[in-house]
């Protein structure tokens, strides 16, 4: 009997090696990475020169009242690898890697607790010819859209995950609405992608998933180091 591993966060190298050794798949549950919207967006941007992007995901945590009352919920604990970057910032990072590939370098500055865990922060991903600005937050809520800047105009997304709308506005003000069909549930397309991979294995695509996951976590590590975010397991 074969078993497949679904990892909600932190797809580690040793898990990847274990999966390969046992001839099974390991999937990281980064739901926006598998949205069909990103294929549509990437195809639309293919003939355009990118000048930069602003991606954000900040949502006030239901655990904030506990934190303010003096408790340390898991999402704000260095023992459980918590914080805004790890919990929500991973979605803008996956979007950037999905659309533009791995950045050359990254940095992150944050509002932090005494245990070094970030409540919110701003990061920059450095590509050869442009930068992607990242905002993540768990003690704030952002209602800002996400934008991708090109030489021809700006592509505006209503959000960075479970995308409903993508509208390109050129420098003359003319607009084009991309054919985005929002899935009925945030995890619908992710689950469908995993099921298809199991039923109809595609090793090339699977390796691309793993490589992109590795790129995301290398960037996360670099960003944490620049902000001084330290997890208990690393001490």
How would you name each of these model-derived features?
Residues 1-33:
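Beta-strand-loop-alpha-helix segment that lines the small-molecule cofactor/substrate pocket
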Residues 4, 30-33, 57, 112, ...:
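Structured beta->alpha junctions
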Residues 12, 38, 92-93, 187-195, ...:
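A general structural signal for well-ordered alpha-helical segments in protein cores
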Residues 21, 193-235:
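C-terminal helix-rich "cap/oligomerization" subdomain common to oxidoreductases
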Residues 32-104:
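Predominantly a Rossmann-like dinucleotide-binding segment in NAD(P)-dependent oxidoreductases
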Residues 79-86, 176-185:
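A short glycine-threonine-serine/GTX helix/turn-capping micro-motif
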Residues 92-164, 191-201:
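Contiguous beta-strand/loop segments that form the cofactor/metal-binding neighborhood of enzyme cores
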């Amino acid at each position: 009997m074969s078993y497949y591993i679904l990892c909600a966060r932190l797809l580690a190298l040793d898990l990847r090696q274990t999966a390969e050794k046992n001839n099974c798949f390991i999937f990281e549950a980064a739901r926006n990475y598998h949205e069909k919207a990103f294929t549509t967006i990437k195809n639309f941007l293919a003939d355009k020169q990118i000048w930069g992007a602003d991606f954000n995901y900040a949502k006030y945590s239901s655990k904030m009242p506990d934190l303010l009352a003096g408790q340390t919920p898991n999402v704000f604990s260095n023992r459980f690898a918590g914080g805004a970057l790890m919990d929500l910032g991973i979605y803008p990072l996956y979007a950037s890697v999905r659309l533009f590939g791995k950045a050359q370098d990254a940095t992150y500055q944050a509002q932090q607790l005494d245990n070094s865990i970030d409540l919110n922060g701003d990061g920059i991903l450095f590509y050869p010819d442009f930068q992607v600005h990242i905002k993540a937050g768990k003690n704030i809520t952002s209602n800002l859209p996400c934008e991708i800047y090109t030489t021809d105009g700006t592509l505006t997304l209503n959000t960075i995950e479970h995308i409903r709308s993508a509208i390109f506005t050129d420098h003359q003000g003319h607009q084009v609405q991309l054919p985005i069909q929002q899935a009925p549930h945030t995890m619908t397309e992710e689950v469908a992608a995993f099921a298809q991979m199991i039923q109809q294995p595609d090793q090339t695509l699977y390796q691309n998933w793993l490589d992109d996951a590795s790129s995301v976590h290398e960037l996360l590590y670099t960003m944490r180091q620049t902000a001084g975010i330290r997890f208990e397991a690393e001490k």
